[in-house]
């Protein structure tokens, strides 16, 4: 590389291009003053962004006090010439006159401000500065529309940006100093809110106007691309760069000096700018030229370049290049770029290596070889690259062949003309590409330094593109125009980037982290320092899917807990978790705020005061805002508790009382009983009812109060559940109510609100268990108590998950809500609202708390009409149901009554058998709406009459079991209590258990204890296959034998077979004193005369489980509450009976056959009545 120190004294404005663009007979001068003025202003804004007299004086000196009306003409003419559009004389005159007026008003304000700053206690000075502020504020509000007149927005854009910048500076002064001037707090807050609104309004107007015109210009030809690129470059310098610092005017977010960096690139093409006429005539493709502009990328810095030379018609020219670059902080691997152009060999390669602050200036010698007897060439025959070295004057340069006179400083002027260009330059060469043999230079602003150095006394902003590692799944996308550079985008969970921070000068300084982002979905943002976590917190969405990125789309996320750097060079990893599918996250920059103890205490107090005041509808704290959740109140309480006792004890006590009052108001409006989960199933008539496996746990790092954990279930027919009823007496007619709460994490959690019908949502909320240990601080206090001063979840009511009126909702927010509309109320019906939580999968789980059921708003309009229609439809359905229920109930009651002797329901009819009881039970279960299908433990409108009949069915089963002295006579328990010889089996046939004796040598018997002298009936239902006989014998030790025989040729019988020989046999007359259990031969034999209903062997009294209803055809879980659909006997079965009078206390029942197969359905031995 040839180092040359000559020609450094050539002023850049003494060099000009022979060819200049002509538009409407006028020249576009490459050294237009507005560029220099804008660059000087930008330097001032980036280096002196500190509120106070120094800033406003500098702003006046740079712009408003330095420019004459004729100078403002240049700002208008700059864009006029670029886009070939003239502003009407009246519009021009009005704009210039108003700009001049603003300058004069600003001068008066500056004078008043300086006087007040010198004598802040002087009443007259305070009044004067306040008056001047109000005058110029009103003047800008009134005049700024003159700088965006329809049809002339583009040529007026640069002066619009200057007026907007002035206005935001004035508003910042009033926000920071307003109360000291004598403005009320309300007035200052109003001004601040207006300032935030204006930042977004001014930014969006500038960017939208710029983008619209840029798209209109297009670049079909290379000549068009020249105009397109010049417009892009100069509007970036005069408008977009200034817009990029607008957010820093927010005095509450940036109360101290703020260091910002611009990472966007601008482009120059010496050949295009020199040989405009040639390329215009040749009409080369501008699209191909634009393709040489780099796509969005992580910021890198020029390192080395190898230049190749070719030869054409007696001219040596630059034909190709290869270059390398490095990332910020010299971290990560060196970046090598592929060959651009061609690798010519007409001369040895020429190497250029970056020195110190890089290349700030290039002198080019372009040439054009016409297509005559050879190939046409547009290229460069020589370049001189000049390096910015502050300690060497003149600085060195690298000269490739013969330098020319096309000076890059003409297109990109210095930011400070009071010093030599190598010190006052504004940009550095970052990259070079080629369109054939025509170089295109890429430049970055010098504010973007090669390291991410953290300063101890300023807010340091670091663009995210200054990372050195872009992880898989993350991308760099074109910036929206107001961010000062490109931004990052990620649409899935995972690491985003790793950036290196230089903390060598601030290792003992504590910092807080903020980051500017936009997102279409809630997510969890994590910052790691190597293998250690710095901070992690949930972040709320700022925009909807498909929306264009606007200024208001970007907000600041903040970590409250300060941290220290422990190393000089610190790698920080940025990670995104818990992002919903389809969600998008855009990251602009990360900020480091010095955590001064006093400042932090004041800042925390201000945040706490703002958070507490935001809870209430007015300053008298009489009512809570509707969108303030109970969970949010708890978090505000934590915020107050974490205030410093040393710096603000009195204020802390006052705020604590206000938060307690807010909590009481929250409890009063909450219609749920026991919202704090003091117990479940603790009271039969109120509060929460739920599964026994639900646990109540005390507060943790997420919940301040109790919360519940719902586990999964192994059987979806027996779900985990939690429910409560809101009584009708608590509800207002024609009102919307809202259920809401906070879910720490969940999977397959179903939430229902049930009245006329059910509103249902399934919530899957990703958890953050792995993130709770991220902080370098301990989560617990000295005594093991939770440290609630750790980073907390920032609440934003505008983006909480809320599903209303059929709207779709991404149920991945920890905050959830579900609403329901109530029509007319009827205390007699007491329909109420059921609140139900349910999990019916094995993988399901949930942790939730801070549940609320509150009145939201009266119903009007369409919502009112909708609930009236739903109510009428429900009542019509109920009337039909009542008619059907009456018919079914009558039929079922008659069948149940027929089982018993009388209305006392304590004795069965003598001929009542098991089939009759099952048949009656089936009729009872035809009653509809006995229990809610959503949860079978909640009674429906027919629950009372169902339970009435079902209890009698249960009594019938008990009485039947009590009078049958044979154990397991229906073989539902297999062969329990039966003695077996040979091969026998119990099989399922037609949903019944039957005894099958397939061989003549097999035998089944049971020893039964009886009362001698009493009469018994032996009743057997069986079926004989094939030849031979099936026999059931009853006998004692000494004779007294009788038997029932079954043949295949007999006529079919049924359960209702009545021999006419039986009387009534009440269970109350059973010989309880004769009870015994199975002996060693009859293992499992139980008391045949047990009178306790809970001892029933065959009947399942599972009333605490699930209910059956045959109207829910889509529910495969038959919620039968013990009901078994007992089918009638198939053809071939016969029921036979005989009377037997034992003489001793023991009899034997024996079952066998002679040949074929003998199938026994049931064996009964029933005690007769005395």
From Swiss-Prot:
PANTHER family from the UniProt entry: ENDOTOXIN_N DOMAIN-CONTAINING PROTEIN-RELATED, PESTICIDAL CRYSTAL PROTEIN N-TERMINAL DOMAIN-CONTAINING PROTEIN
Function, in words: Promotes colloidosmotic lysis by binding to the midgut epithelial cells of many lepidopteran larvae. Toxic to Plutella xylostella.
A biological process from GO: sporulation resulting in formation of a cellular spore
Taxonomic superkingdom: Bacteria
Gene: cry1Jb
Short name of one Pfam family: Cry1Ac_dom-VII
Assigned protein family: Belongs to the delta endotoxin family.
Keywords: Sporulation, Toxin, Virulence
InterPro entries: Cry1Ac-like_dom-VII, Cry_V, Galactose-bd-like_sf, Pest_crys, Pest_crys_Cry1Aa_dom-IV, Pest_crys_dom-III, Pest_crys_dom_I, Pest_crys_N_sf
Protein name, entry field: Pesticidal crystal protein Cry1Jb
Further remarks about this protein from its record: Toxic segment of the protein is located in the N-terminus.
Lineage: Bacteria, Bacillati, Bacillota, Bacilli, Bacillales
């Amino acid at each position: 590389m040839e180092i040359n120190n000559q020609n450094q004294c050539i002023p850049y404005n003494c060099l000009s291009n022979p060819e200049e663009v002509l538009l409407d007979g006028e020249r576009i001068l490459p050294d237009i003053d507005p560029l220099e003025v804008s660059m000087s202003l930008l330097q001032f804004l980036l280096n002196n962004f500190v509120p106070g007299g120094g800033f406003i004086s500098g702003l006046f000196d740079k712009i408003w006090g330095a420019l004459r009306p004729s100078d403002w003409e240049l700002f208008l003419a700059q864009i006029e010439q670029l886009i070939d559009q003239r502003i009407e004389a009246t519009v021009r005159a009005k704009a210039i006159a108003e700009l001049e007026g603003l300058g004069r008003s600003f001068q008066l304000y500056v004078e008043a401000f300086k006087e007040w700053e010198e004598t802040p206690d002087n009443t007259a000075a305070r009044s004067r500065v306040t008056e001047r502020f109000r005058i110029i504020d009103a003047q800008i509000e009134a005049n700024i529309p003159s700088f965006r007149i329809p049809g002339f927005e583009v040529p007026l854009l640069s002066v619009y940006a200057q007026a907007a910048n002035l206005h935001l500076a004035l508003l910042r002064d009033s926000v920071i100093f307003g109360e000291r001037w004598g403005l009320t707090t309300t007035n200052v807050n109003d001004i601040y809110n207006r300032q935030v609104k204006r930042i977004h309004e001014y930014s969006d107007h500038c960017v939208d106007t710029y983008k619209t015109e840029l798209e209109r210009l297009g670049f079909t030809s290379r000549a068009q691309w020249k105009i397109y690129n010049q417009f892009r470059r100069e509007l970036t310098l005069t408008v977009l760069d200034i817009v990029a610092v607008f957010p820093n005017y927010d005095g509450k977010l940036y109360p101290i000096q703020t260091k910002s960096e611009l990472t966007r690139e601008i482009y120059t093409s010496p050949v295009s700018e020199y040989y405009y006429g040639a390329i215009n005539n040749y009409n080369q493709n501008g699209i191909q030229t634009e393709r040489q502009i780099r796509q969005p990328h992580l910021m890198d810095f020029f390192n080395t370049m190898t230049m190749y030379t070719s030869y054409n018609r007696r001219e040596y020219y630059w034909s190709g290049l290869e270059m390398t670059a490095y990332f910020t902080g010299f971290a990560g691997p060196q970046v090598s770029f592929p060959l651009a152009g061609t690798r010519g060999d007409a001369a040895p390669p020429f190497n250029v290596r970056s020195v110190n602050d890089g290349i700030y200036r290039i002198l080019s010698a372009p040439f054009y070889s016409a297509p005559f007897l050879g190939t046409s060439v547009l290229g460069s025959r020589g370049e001189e690259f000049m390096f910015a070295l502050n300690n060497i004057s003149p600085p060195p340069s690298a000269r490739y062949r013969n330098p020319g006179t096309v000076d890059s400083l003409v297109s990109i002027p210095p930011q400070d003309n009071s010093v030599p260009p190598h010190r006052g330059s504004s940009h550095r060469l970052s990259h070079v590409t080629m369109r054939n043999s025509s170089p295109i230079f890429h430049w970055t602003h010098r504010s973007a330094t090669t390291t991410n150095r953290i300063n101890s006394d300023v807010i340091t902003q670091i663009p995210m593109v200054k990372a050195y590692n872009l992880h898989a799944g993350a991308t760099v996308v074109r910036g929206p125009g107001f961010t000062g550079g490109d931004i990052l985008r990620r649409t899935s969970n995972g690491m985003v980037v790793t950036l290196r921070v230089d903390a060598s000068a601030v290792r003992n300084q504590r910092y807080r982290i903020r980051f500017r982002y936009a997102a279409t979905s809630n997510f969890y943002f994590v910052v790691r320092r190597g293998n250690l976590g710095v901070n992690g917190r949930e972040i709320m969405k700022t925009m909807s899917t498909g929306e264009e990125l606007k200024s208001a789309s970007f907000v600041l996320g903040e970590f409250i807990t300060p941290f220290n750097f422990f190393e000089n060079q610190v790698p920080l990893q940025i990670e995104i978790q818990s992002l919903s599918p389809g969600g998008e996250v855009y990251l602009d920059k990360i900020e480091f705020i010095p955590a001064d103890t006093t400042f932090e205490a004041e800042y925390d107090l201000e945040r706490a005061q703002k958070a507490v005041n935001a809870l209430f509808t007015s300053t008298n704290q009489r009512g809570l805002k509707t969108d303030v959740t109970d969970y949010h109140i708890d978090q505000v309480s934590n915020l107050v508790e974490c205030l410093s006792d040393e710096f603000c004890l009195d204020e802390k006590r006052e705020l604590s009382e206000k938060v307690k009052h807010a909590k009481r108001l929250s409890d009063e409006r909450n219609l749920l009983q026991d919202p704090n989960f003091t117990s479940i199933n603790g009271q039969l008539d109120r509060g929460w009812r739920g599964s026994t496996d639900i646990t109540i746990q005390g507060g943790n790092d997420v919940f301040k109060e109790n919360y519940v954990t719902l586990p999964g279930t192994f059987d979806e027919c027996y779900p985990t559940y939690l429910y409560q009823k809101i009584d009708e007496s608590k509800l207002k007619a024609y009102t919307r109510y809202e259920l809401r709460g906070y879910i720490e994490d969940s999977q397959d959690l179903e939430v229902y609100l049930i009245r006329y019908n059910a509103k249902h949502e399934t919530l899957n909320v990703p958890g953050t268990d792995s993130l709770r240990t991220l902080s370098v601080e301990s989560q617990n206090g000295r005594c093991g108590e939770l440290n609630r001063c750790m980073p907390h979840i920032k609440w934003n009511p505008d983006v909480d998950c809320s599903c209303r009126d059929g709207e779709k909702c991404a149920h991945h927010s920890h905050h959830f809500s579900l609403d329901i509309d109530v029509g007319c109320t009827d205390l007699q019906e007491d329909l109420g609202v059921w609140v139900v939580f349910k999990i019916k999968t094995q993988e399901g789980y949930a942790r939730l708390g801070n549940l609320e059921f509150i009145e939201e708003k009266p119903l009007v309009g369409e919502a009112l009409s909708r609930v009236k229609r739903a109510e009428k439809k429900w009542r019509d359905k109920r009337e039909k149901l009542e008619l059907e229920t009456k018919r079914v109930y009558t039929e079922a009651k008659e069948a149940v009554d027929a089982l018993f002797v009388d209305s006392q329901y304590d004795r069965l009819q003598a001929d009542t058998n098991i089939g009759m009881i099952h048949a009656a039970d089936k009729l009872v279960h035809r009653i509809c709406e006995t229990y809610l299908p959503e949860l079978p433990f909640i009674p429906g409108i027919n629950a009372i009459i169902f339970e009435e009949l079902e209890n009698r069915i249960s009594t019938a089963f008990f009485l039947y079991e009590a009078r049958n002295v044979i154990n397991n006579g229906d073989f539902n328990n297999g062969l329990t209590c039966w003695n077996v010889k040979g091969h026998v089996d119990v099989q399922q046939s037609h949903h019944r258990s039957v005894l099958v004796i397939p061989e003549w040598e097999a035998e089944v018997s049971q020893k039964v204890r009886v009362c001698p002298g009493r009469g018994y009936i032996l009743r057997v239902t069986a079926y004989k296959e094939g030849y031979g006989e099936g026999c059931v014998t009853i006998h004692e030790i000494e004779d007294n034998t009788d038997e029932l025989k079954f043949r295949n040729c007999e006529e079919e019988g049924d359960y209702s077979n009545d021999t006419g020989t039986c009387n009534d046999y009440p269970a109350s007359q059973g010989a309880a004193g004769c009870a015994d259990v199975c002996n060693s031969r009859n293992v499992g034999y139980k008391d045949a005369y047990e009178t306790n209903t809970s001892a029933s062997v065959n009947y399942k009294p599972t009333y605490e489980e699930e209910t059956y209803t045959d109207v829910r055809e889509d529910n495969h879980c038959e919620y039968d509450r013990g009901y078994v659909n007992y089918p009638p006997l198939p053809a071939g079965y016969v029921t036979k009976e005989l009377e037997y009078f034992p003489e001793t206390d023991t009899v034997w029942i024996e079952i066998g056959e002679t040949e074929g197969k003998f199938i026994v359905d049931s064996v009964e031995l029933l005690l007769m009545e005395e």
